[in-house]
Swiss-Prot record:
Localization terms from the record: Cytoplasm; Preautophagosomal structure membrane
Encoding gene, per UniProt annotation: ATG17
Coiled coil: 324-355
Record GO biological process: autophagosome assembly; autophagy of mitochondrion; piecemeal microautophagy of the nucleus; protein transport
Family: Belongs to the ATG17 family.
Annotated knockout phenotype: Does not significantly decrease the growth rate under nutrient-rich conditions.
Keywords: Autophagy, Coiled coil, Cytoplasm, Membrane, Protein transport, Transport
Role according to the record: Autophagy-specific protein that functions with ATG13, ATG29, and CIS1/ATG31 in response to autophagy-inducing signals as a scaffold to recruit other ATG proteins to organize pre-autophagosomal structure (PAS) formation. Modulates the timing and magnitude of the autophagy response, such as the size of the sequestering vesicles, through interacting with and regulating ATG1 kinase activity. Plays particularly a role in pexophagy and nucleophagy. With ATG13, is required for ATG1 activation by autophosphorylation. Recruits ATG9 to the pre-autophagosomal structure.
Annotated segments matching region Disordered: 1-50
Protein name, per record: Autophagy-related protein 17
GO MF entry, a single one: protein kinase activator activity
Top-rank taxon, per record: Eukaryota
Compositionally biased residues, Polar residues: 1-11
Keyword Cytoplasm: yes
Length: 519
């Protein structure tokens, strides 16, 4: 009977959760279903129909039929809702799987990163140890090199006195008489050793870059959380499924209403012809919506429907329900549209979370690959540490050897400067000896000259006294003059030429030698 089938046009559920209730559901009456705990929204109720109620015009019934037919185009929206619900389930499963995999990878990578940081600290300890020795070595180098440079500067500022050099020669310093190439060679060798010691820096920097890049990937990875206050994915999924179920139920109600309209037309005289004509007109102007009124009428005529009224009272009640439900068709269609709009928006949120999870998983795969590359290079970093230690011992020994050479050069140059001062003193001493010898010979010459003068006087007296008595041929030397004596220096081995050294030069040399002896 019609009364038994005219339950309600709108059977939409308000949703599994209060957060997804439909905005129009407040206008509907709610009643409990014995087979479900979910509430029913916006259902139609009707009272017993008066058999004597006024009849409804055929035009009105046909209009209701056409509107009901047009409302069935909501099927595409319901299919889309079902598609979204299925995709949301798959997306939710994917998010859960991706989040679990990304979380597992992240924890493993963080553990490995911690180990890498410990290894890096160990390498840093070796580097710091070498750096401390290196600083001590540099200080020693600066001290020795500074002393050597100071000594060379002193030689550069010390001019060689002209008394030691040929006349007309350009003024020269003590530094001009030594080969500076030895000093430069030692310095270059030390620089090379220092560069060898600093080569470990590059390995540490590369290791730091590897760890920093790995951490950046992890840091840039979107955070995944199961806290529904941040990502209520399960709540959204429930809402989408609830929307889809309600939309399907609403579509069932629309279909039921359409079937009742067809039954009402079919049981009204002249209704079928008018309905077919009006449907054809609508099809010509608005296009085919995929629902054939003729086909439904033929199906109902070949198969007795539960909607078929058995009495006039049943038919009157059916018409009453049709009229009541017809007033709600547009609202039901609008509700389906609004629910689909809400589903599309919620699905975008789920898709965003899916994309975030996918990106997080992709980042973790990238981080895992980077970790593998670091693992391949880790042996090189550890080998670099061992190589650094061995090279440090060798190069340090080489540097200390060069430092000893520089110290020896410094001492040699200092002795060279002191020897020059000693040379000045020696030249002055020799000149003093020459002066003393000359004084002695000058005094001796005076005494000899006096003796010779006395000898000449005695010879003259002798000639005057006895010269006329002695024949000249008795002694050939009787008429000879006195012998002359002259002291002259030997030309060989003469070592002091030119003017004497200035007193200030000699005193300066003595003062410097005195300072050296007091050290």
């Amino acid at each position: 009977m019609a009364s038994s089938s005219a339950t309600s046009l709108r059977q939409g559920s308000s949703g599994a959760s209060s957060g997804h209730s439909h905005p129009q559901s407040t206008s509907l009456s709610r009643h409990s279903n014995s087979n479900s705990n979910s509430s029913r929204s916006r259902s139609f109720t009707h009272q017993d129909v008066d058999p004597n109620a006024p009849s409804i015009s055929i035009d009105t019934l046909v209009n209701h039929l056409l509107v009901a037919k047009r409302s069935l185009s909501s099927m595409t929206l319901v299919l889309r809702a079902n598609e979204i619900a299925n995709a949301a389930r798959q997306s939710h499963e994917d998010v859960a799987i991706l989040a679990a995999q990304a979380g597992f990878l992240k924890e493993s990578i963080l553990d490995q990163t911690t180990i890498l940081v410990r290894v890096r600290r160990s390498l840093q300890g070796t580097y710091d140890w070498g750096k401390r020795d290196f600083k001590k070595l540099i200080r020693s180098m600066d001290l020795v090199d500074g002393g050597l440079e100071q000594t060379m500067e002193m030689l550069r500022d010390t001019s060689v006195e002209g008394v030691f050099r040929p006349e007309g020669e350009e003024r020269r310093s003590l530094l001009d008489f030594i080969d500076e190439g030895g000093v430069h060679g030692v310095r270059e060798a030390m620089k090379k050793s220092i560069q060898e010691l600093q080569s470990f820096d590059g390995d540490l920097l590369r290791f730091d870059t590897d760890i920093r890049n790995l951490r950046k990937i992890i840091t840039d990875t979107p955070a995944l959380t199961h806290d529904d206050t941040h990502f209520p994915t399960f709540e959204l999924l429930e809402g989408l499924v609830d929307h889809s179920a309600n939309m399907a139920q609403l579509l069932v109600s629309l279909t039921h209403h359409f079937d009742m309209c067809v039954t009402a037309i079919r049981t009204t005289e002249g209704g079928v012809a008018l309905a077919r004509r009006r449907a054809a007109e609508v099809t010509q102007t608005q296009g085919n919506d995929g629902v054939s009124i003729s086909g439904v009428i033929a199906e109902q005529e070949s198969n007795v429907s539960d909607l078929e009224p058995n009495t006039a009272k049943d038919r009157a009640e059916m018409l009453k329900v049709v009229v009541q439900d017809a007033g709600e068709v547009n609202d039901v269609v609008q509700e389906i549209q609004e629910r689909l709009t809400a589903m599309e928006q919620d699905y975008l949120v789920l898709q965003e979370q899916h994309d975030i999870s996918k990106q997080a998983y992709s980042n973790m795969l990238e981080a895992y690959a980077v970790l593998g590359e670091i693992g391949d290079r880790l042996a090189d970093y550890l080998a670099a540490e061992g190589d650094f230690k061995s090279r440090w011992d060798m190069e340090k020994e080489s540097v200390f050897s060069k430092l000893q050479e520089m110290q020896q050069l410094k001492e040699f140059y200092e002795r060279y400067a002191s020897a020059y001062d000693s040379l000045i003193i020696e030249v002055e001493r020799r000149r003093a000896v020459d002066d003393k010898v000359k004084n002695i010979w000058r005094k001796a010459q005076d005494s000899v000259d006096k003796l010779l003068d006395a000898d000449r006087a005695s010879r003259e007296t002798f000639r005057q006294d006895v010269g006329e008595y002695l024949p000249t041929d008795l002694w050939a030397g009787m008429q000879g003059s006195a012998k002359k004596w002259t002291v002259v220096p030997d030309g060989e081995g003469e070592d002091v030429k030119g003017p004497a050294l200035r007193r200030s030069v000699v005193e300066g040399a003595r003062e410097r030698l005195g300072r050296v002896e007091r050290r």
